[in-house]
Amino acid sequence: MAKHLFTSESVSEGHPDKIADQISDAVLDAILEQDPKARVACETYVKTGMVLVGGEITTSAWVDIEEITRNTVREIGYVHSDMGFDANSCAVLSAIGKQSPDINQGVDRADPLEQGAGDQGLMFGYATNETDVLMPAPITYAHRLVQRQAEVRKNGSLPWLRPDAKSQVTFQYDDGKIVGIDAVVLSTQHSEDIDQKSLQEAVMEEIIKPVLPTEWLNASTKFFINPTGRFVIGGPMGDCGLTGRKIIVDTYGGMARHGGGAFSGKDPSKVDRSAAYAARYVAKNIVAAGLADRCEIQVSYAIGVAEPTSIMVETFGTEKLPTEQLTLLVREFFDLRPYGLIQMLDLLHPIYKETAAYGHFGREHFPWEKTDKAAVLRDAAGLK
């Protein structure tokens, strides 16, 4: 492989689409806390002064949608009209219905192991050994930049920062290996009382330099900090936000394929979410076991059917044993039926709000990031 560039982007928790994702997952968590078997498909729309929460929810739980919404927006940091959005005064509208019984009859079964998939669809999982968390470097460092932006905003180090921000990092590869960072873009919302030069210097010193490894930076690395020159109007005042609009940010930054289904607001019976988590778990354990340097898993389902309609393993020529054998190992050691993967990853808990900003993958405390199958896979493969 020749030299090439690869770019990934991320957005902060204060980005309008991410506000929507976090509200949807906060509602999901509140319901799962009371009713782990609830069926939840919660969508959120945010715009200046308004939040609309809709979807289909079937549950025995009662939750206060308005309070959950305001608390989520408040935690993100939109607490004053000067920021273009205020948790205390925004309107909160609710349009919640129940899950169709036609769907429900295809999912629920007397035998839990026969629980059908909540919909048809295809999902991908990916892992690579180019970072310690077995994620692609471009998306990993794009996330870390906007996480750092939120950190210095919330701890008061840079009090003129506002919640909305975006990052983008372009890595240089040579023969598939990282050799440097070619370009960094960071745009952050800010108050009126900071000039462009001071902002750029502070962002470089307090956000970019603490995050990006110096060995990947060189004299030709380009930095674009608030390149338009002004970013005062942001958040839902600048753009409307919708749940499920940042699916590449949520996953692998474009380095792997995507089945198209969003995650936030969906309970684990929706394979769009749970099977994508399981596919990451499978791919990560294959790479952690040393069976491949890169691994992409595809699974697919039919609505109401428990067994996956297909499982594919792609290792991009980095495999240490034939992919046919890898596929057999996946089928042997991972239960990818909807109920099986829910049990395997212990998904019926309120753990989802935290996933809704800074990526669903590559953060070690989530259950789908465990590498507890790596040793058994390696033994079964006969590798020393």
From Swiss-Prot:
K(+) binds at residue 43. Keywords: ATP-binding, Cytoplasm, Magnesium, Metal-binding, Nucleotide-binding, One-carbon metabolism, Potassium, Transferase. Pfam families: S-AdoMet_synt_C (PF02773), S-AdoMet_synt_M (PF02772), S-AdoMet_synt_N (PF00438). It catalyses: L-methionine + ATP + H2O = S-adenosyl-L-methionine + phosphate + diphosphate. Pathway: Amino-acid biosynthesis; S-adenosyl-L-methionine biosynthesis; S-adenosyl-L-methionine from L-methionine: step 1/1. L-methionine binds at residues 56, 99, 239, 270. Its main location: cytoplasm. Mg(2+) binds at residue 17. It is found in: Cytoplasm. CDD domains: S-AdoMet_synt. Its cofactor is Mg(2+); K(+). ATP binds at residues 15, 164-166, 230-231, 239, 245-246, 262, 266. Binds 2 divalent ions per subunit. GO terms for molecular function: ATP binding; magnesium ion binding; methionine adenosyltransferase activity. One of its GO terms (biological process) is S-adenosylmethionine biosynthetic process. Its EC number is 2.5.1.6. Residues 99-109 are annotated as: Flexible loop. GO terms for cellular component: cytoplasm. Homotetramer; dimer of dimers. Belongs to the AdoMet synthase family. Catalyzes the formation of S-adenosylmethionine (AdoMet) from methionine and ATP. The overall synthetic reaction is composed of two sequential steps, AdoMet formation and the subsequent tripolyphosphate hydrolysis which occurs prior to release of AdoMet from the enzyme. This is S-adenosylmethionine synthase. It comes from Enterobacter sp. (strain 638). The lineage of its organism: Bacteria, Pseudomonadati, Pseudomonadota, Gammaproteobacteria, Enterobacterales. The gene is metK.
